[in-house]
Amino acid sequence: MIPGEIIAASGDIELNAGAPTVTLEVSNTGDRPVQVGSHYHFAETNAGLSFDRAVARGKRLDIPAGTAVRFEPGQTRSVTLIPLSGKREVYGFRQLVMGKL
């Protein structure tokens, strides 16, 4: 073993196993690309993205940590969301929640 080396178990790793999911159609109505990170509170994303924000409240993208989804101007794509976990408190972002969900 090399110091700092990580040896993963064999087989596939399933991300967010058992988490309930919801799929939304999202359109970028703006004239600039919008990139959303893996742990961003999706309901508070850029106002140029058009989707059902009530459904997205308390949820984040179902993608690996540290990655992002990019929406080009005029693009519509489907995204899968999962609930935020932990204390389920949201602070910052666009300051639309600032507390418990």
From Swiss-Prot:
One of its GO terms (cellular component) is urease complex. It comes from the Bacteria. Keywords: Cytoplasm, Hydrolase. Pathway: Nitrogen metabolism; urea degradation; CO(2) and NH(3) from urea (urease route): step 1/1. It catalyses: urea + 2 H2O + H(+) = hydrogencarbonate + 2 NH4(+). Gene3D superfamilies: Urease, beta subunit. It is found in: Cytoplasm. The keyword Magnesium does not apply. GO terms for biological process: urea catabolic process. Its EC number is 3.5.1.5. CDD domains: Urease_beta. InterPro entries: Urease_beta-like, Urease_betasu_sf, Urease_subunit. It is an enzyme of class 3 (hydrolase). One of its GO terms (molecular function) is urease activity. Pfam families: Urease_beta (PF00699). Belongs to the urease beta subunit family. Heterotrimer of UreA (gamma), UreB (beta) and UreC (alpha) subunits. Three heterotrimers associate to form the active enzyme. This is Urease subunit beta. It comes from Rhizobium johnstonii (strain DSM 114642 / LMG 32736 / 3841). The gene is ureB.
